[in-house]
């Protein structure tokens, strides 16, 4: 009996320590940098983007944002799941205010959890702070005398996505960035659609992983159908405020000409 009590005590302490570690991991503030050389950027100055997705219940850390600002991004893109059910409107707005301090345009696309929030309240916050919202549409973006396009696809899980509508006005000769919360958008893209960069989140990198095993793959970069892509682990968590083997992350993405 005494041995079993000791074992139970050891297991309890170990479980508590592991939970504390997972909680601390979930509160991390990591800024990853990526450089995508693209043929359409030849002869143009580099374009730098701060990309963040899956914020959920977190407040974006000010020191993290200061570090990101040091890269002088031209654009901020929120890849969906800015919030979820139960997140106070004041916290959502505070996160937007913190991003507004970059002093550059902010683009937002919807994630599945954003639909758990009162839509009129989200729109009110976006309108108050000049956030550009994309729902199956595209907008031009100019920097340093050059113009690119950003297309945003609405959430796939909520069956709100209309990819063809989002890209219908794109000029294949110019640089085109596609933003969709769910990386399953890769399946809808054709090689001749003129998409150069795809930014997504949603998966949280599995959020809780045991070695190579998790509900989703870790976030990553790569090439699919002639487009460079980034799938982010995301910044926040859902269900439980814990992470294991899938650190939270935000991103500085630099698009430049080939060497």
Curated annotation (Swiss-Prot):
InterPro entries in the cross-refs: Calcineurin-like_PHP_ApaH, Metallo-depent_PP-like, Metallophosphoesterase_sf
Organism for this UniProt entry: Bacillus subtilis (strain 168)
Protein name as catalogued: Uncharacterized protein YpbG
An MF annotation (GO) of this entry: UDP-2,3-diacylglucosamine hydrolase activity
Keywords attached to this entry: ATP-binding, Nucleotide-binding, Signal
Cleaved signal peptide residues: 1-19
Induction: Transcribed under partial control of SigM ECF sigma factor.
Annotated Pfam families: Metallophos (PF00149)
Any single Gene Ontology cellular-component annotation: membrane
Cross-referenced CDD domains: MPP_YkuE_C
Any GO BP annotation: lipid A biosynthetic process
Domain of life: Bacteria
Keyword check for Acetylation: no
Gene3D superfamilies from the UniProt entry: 3.60.21.10
Entry binding sites for ATP: 214-221
